[in-house]
Curated annotation (Swiss-Prot):
Top-rank lineage group of the source organism: Eukaryota
Catalytically driven reaction(s): D-erythrose 4-phosphate + phosphoenolpyruvate + H2O = 7-phospho-2-dehydro-3-deoxy-D-arabino-heptonate + phosphate
Protein name: Probable phospho-2-dehydro-3-deoxyheptonate aldolase, chloroplastic
BP term (GO), one: aromatic amino acid family biosynthetic process
E.C. number: 2.5.1.54
Gene from which the chain derives: DHS1
Swiss-Prot/TrEMBL keywords: Amino-acid biosynthesis, Aromatic amino acid biosynthesis, Chloroplast, Plastid, Transferase, Transit peptide
GO molecular function, one term: 3-deoxy-7-phosphoheptulonate synthase activity
Similarity comment: Belongs to the class-II DAHP synthase family.
Annotated pathway: Metabolic intermediate biosynthesis; chorismate biosynthesis; chorismate from D-erythrose 4-phosphate and phosphoenolpyruvate: step 1/7
Length: 493
């Protein structure tokens, strides 16, 4: 399974005395052991609006409905209007490439996607915390160096969230597939070459290869690498950061906890302590590519898009009658919906109904991106609409994309204070609405300032957080989780 780099922190649910409130269980991402909850509060991380499912549906009925649905939409997306798809100049070459991809083994397996959906269902019920992150857009030529840095950043964020927030963390990376991005302009100029502005590396292939002096055969060797086991990590980068002392304090507390576990016979050599789980995700944009990697699962008979464990539909492609929504309703992967201040509450309810007609927990994650001011005004209406429809979703805040501005040099940047303001607004709104939230971020390992942006701006789309900012955000969220936990425990009988 692939790796993520920084944080997409989801949210958690306030305790409720309603009869449908589930019994709480700890689920560790890398083990099946269970612990008795410390109190009546849910532990962590995805905001689940506290309403029961609209219509209780048995597993057999849900499977039958899903099979019927899949058989009807496997090819039907081609008859719908598809925005943001490039105009391929040579359909013959395109067909040849798609047939080659169809013959490839899957990048992920259906069972893995099902496992992620189960974990996201725990997040939707308030029993886990979603940590999602990665570059806005990937490049074929630097995957391996980036993955190493992302893994270090994610490990430090996860450590702070798990130990500081006392909750299991689900780690999902925006990687091993986030090569294509929708753009406002169909073409853009780069070093004298006019490239497709819509879809990046997979579309402007020959021009990019010419520009970067990188042969397609070499680039293909770098497309994806999946890891299922963690390795020792070098976290020296925190020693000289503003958060270094806080992180070292946390490390000492973790060491004390490990000492206690060792005394109880659970050492760091135990398989539970030596492995971890990472999941991949990307935007479902290039539909011919996505269909070429879609496979029927022999176990369930369902279709899974095996290009990633989780897919999402973007702000520019989420039309109810569009090709992207039509395709996504036909695959059984966990799905995300990107939502801005433009989203109408009723439209969101209808979109969730289309993508998750059986109201299955873990199927839908709503990723909100609209800036701090819009968050306080628009988000309450979205939460109330979804809650009123009785829909089970995981709410996530993406504070990056709503805070992109242009620096004087013309390059894009994001003010960290604006990012923090949106995160705080997201938490405040959910607290106001009776739920408690989290965040998604795109992060990296380089500090980018106005002064050195021209020489250190290596991202292929929008700017990243650096490692220090990513860690700082994790500290802020974990400390808020701990504070809220203390308040809830103080009021527990």
């Amino acid at each position: 399974m692939a790796m993520s780099n920084t944080s997409a922190l989801a949210s958690k649910l306030l305790p409720s005395c309603k009869p449908h409130q589930p019994t709480l269980t700890f689920f560790s991402p890398s083990t099946t052991c269970q612990k008795k909850p410390r109190s009546s509060r849910p532990i962590s991380a995805a905001v689940h609006v506290t309403q029961p499912p609209k219509t209780p549906i048995s597993s057999a009925t849900a499977t039958k409905r899903r099979l019927s649905l899949l058989n009807g939409v496997w090819e039907s997306w081609k008859s719908k209007k598809a925005l943001q798809l490039p105009e391929y100049p040579d359909e013959g070459k395109l067909d040849g490439v798609l047939k080659t991809i169809e013959a490839f083994p899957p990048l992920v397996f259906a069972g893995e996607a099902r496992s992620l959906e189960e974990k996201l269902a725990q997040a939707a019920m308030g029993n886990a915390f979603l940590l999602q992150g990665g570059d806005c857009a990937e490049s074929f030529k630097e995957l391996m160096p980036l993955y190493s840095r992302y893994f270090q950043n994610t490990a430090s964020d996860e450590c702070r969230l798990t130990f500081g927030g006392q909750c299991p963390v689900i780690k999902v990376g925006r990687m091993a597939g986030q090569f294509a991005k929708p753009r406002l302009d169909p073409f853009e100029e780069k070093d004298g070459l006019w490239l497709s502005g819509a879809n990046g590396w997979p579309v402007a292939w020959e021009a990019y290869c010419k520009l970067q002096q990188l042969s397609p055969s070499r680039a293909l060797l770098l497309v994806v690498c999946c890891y299922a086991e963690s390795h020792p990590m070098d976290l020296d980068f925190v020693e000289h950061s503003e958060q270094g002392d806080r992180y070292q304090e946390l490390a000492h507390r973790v060491d004390e906890a490990l000492g206690f576990m060792d005394a109880c016979g659970l050492t760091v050599d135990h398989p539970i302590m030596a492995t971890t789980e990472f999941w991949t995700s990307h935007e479902c944009l290039l539909l011919p590519y996505e269909q070429a990697l879609t496979r029927e699962d022999s176990t369930s008979g369902l279709f899974y898009d095996c290009s990633a464990h989780m897919l999402w539909v973007g702000e520019r492609t989420r039309q109810l009658d569009g090709a992207h929504v039509e395709f996504l309703r036909g695959v059984a992967n966990p799905l995300g919906i990107k939502v801005s201040q433009k989203m109408d509450p009723n439209e969101l309810v209808n979109l969730i109904e289309i993508l998750n007609p059986t109201n299955k927990p873990g199927r839908i994650t709503v990723i909100v991106r609209m800036g701090a001011e819009n968050m306080r005004v628009k988000l309450p209406h979205l939460i109330r609409a979804v809650r009123g429809a009785g829909q089970i979703v995981t709410w996530v805040c993406d504070p990056m994309h709503g805070n992109t501005i242009k620096a004087p040099c013309g390059l894009k940047t994001r003010a960290f204070d604006a990012i923090l303001a949106e995160v705080r607004a997201f938490y405040d709104v959910h607290e106001q609405e009776g739920t408690l939230p989290g965040t998604e971020c795109v992060g990296g390992s380089r500090t980018i300032t106005y002064d050195d942006r021209q020489t250190r701006y290596h991202t292929h789309c929008d700017p990243r957080l650096n490692a220090s900012q990513s860690l700082e955000l994790a500290f802020i969220i974990a400390e808020r989780l701990r504070k809220e936990e203390s308040v809830l425990n103080a009021h527990s009988p």
